[in-house]
Amino acid sequence: MKTLYSRRRFYHVETLFNGTLALAGRDQETTGFAWWAGNARLINLSGKLLGAHVAHAGLIVFWAGAMNLFEVAHFVPEKPMYEQGLILLPHLATLGWGVGPGGEVIDTFPYFVSGVLHLISSAVLGFGGIYHALLGPETLEESFPFFGYVWKDRNKMTTILGIHLILLGIGAFLLVFKALYFGGVYDTWAPGGGDVRKITNLTLSPSIIFGYLLKSPFGGEGWIVSVDDLEDIIGGHVWLGSICILGGIWHILTKPFAWARRALVWSGEAYLSYSLGALAVFGFIACCFVWFNNTAYPSEFYGPTGPEASQAQAFTFLVRDQRLGANVGSAQGPTGLGKYLMRSPTGEVIFGGETMRFWDLRAPWLEPLRGPNGLDLSRLKKDIQPWQERRSAEYMTHAPLGSLNSVGGVATEINAVNYVSPRSWLATSHFVLGFFFFVGHLWHAGRARAAAAGFEKGIDRDFEPVLSMTPLN
């Protein structure tokens, strides 16, 4: 295969390497990268790079299957999922598998099947990864030109992009088909405290779906994270899946326009940086979604959101004190504002106390008590159902706050319960990983742009002092 660029110009940072550790000819002399630079050694070996990626997919799927079975083995049906440190079973339950009314787990067998299927898949991927890493052809261009590529071949790169987009679109439609035809998904808003249901009346109106993108990210607006009904979520997946598939077909059939050829850097490291940037955005959005959204991430499985736990505490004490004879409509708190209820600046009736900052919370156990002007006093006096009391008392004591005292007014006690909410884990991990991916995006973008501009970054390796020193061994 003809190399389209000089190695010196493209591999602009050379790394020190102990030659005795050369692996199958992929040493620093032949690649410009040391063993610890990992897959960078395989930039021009498409067959070996395929092996690395397939093996990596095998590791990911193996973790999913093994962790899935671990959670099934430790699962106690009598306790809520969020009390058991589970992060995978809540996702399966949200998809409607194994759960019934109120999010109660009625069958763990689907979870077991999911774990086993992932383990079997990981074995296939693992075998493929080892085969392509050790036995398969080093490069695919000669024997399998369809799967071969040169990083600078812009047309081939957009074709690969198109194939990826089509696969993502199919993934989005898998959720749509599950919700429409294959048993439905769990809806936390179903009457009486949540249930699995098929989604029949999809929201396909572009003004509603794309209206989410135009909303402010702040306060009661909340951008796309504010979505609170499954019709909109599944309808959004129809739109996303369609856009991905049509965009994929477009990128397969067309060549990049002149402005794109000029504006973008066309090298392996540049594509890596673009991908890391996209994943960073996904991570930050996922962080906000799992922290604030209790429709896509139902509180029955993931535990309450922070605002939800705070509002649940206000509601629980309102119920208690109302039973003890308090007039919750007029009682004053220590600041002179309403102790149980007050008005927001725009006039809605909201819970009083520190939880006032979370006045815009929407939760299935609370919404039935609202009227046209916020919380309805007559409903609070006459219509509170036992399931609402039970759920709010449960959520009050399971805030996703660790043991910080008085966050949003939630009374926490470090000795009370050994509990970390899955929302805390998932939100924190996705924020931290999203940040790392963003730094990786900046790093690889800088290297790729430097290489494209034809200059090297870093110290001059030819006259580096360490080269004149005795080897360690």
From Swiss-Prot:
Pfam families: PSII
Main location: plastid
Residues carrying Phosphothreonine: 15
Propiece residues: 1-14
Membrane topology: Multi-pass membrane protein
Alphabetized UniProt keyword annotations: Acetylation, Chlorophyll, Chloroplast, Chromophore, Manganese, Membrane, Metal-binding, Phosphoprotein, Photosynthesis, Photosystem II, Plastid, Thylakoid, Transmembrane, Transmembrane helix
Assembly behavior: PSII is composed of 1 copy each of membrane proteins PsbA, PsbB, PsbC, PsbD, PsbE, PsbF, PsbH, PsbI, PsbJ, PsbK, PsbL, PsbM, PsbT, PsbX, PsbY, PsbZ, Psb30/Ycf12, at least 3 peripheral proteins of the oxygen-evolving complex and a large number of cofactors. It forms dimeric complexes.
Function, in words: One of the components of the core complex of photosystem II (PSII). It binds chlorophyll and helps catalyze the primary light-induced photochemical processes of PSII. PSII is a light-driven water:plastoquinone oxidoreductase, using light energy to abstract electrons from H(2)O, generating O(2) and a proton gradient subsequently used for ATP formation.
Protein name: Photosystem II CP43 reaction center protein
Originating organism: Solanum bulbocastanum
Gene designation per UniProt: psbC
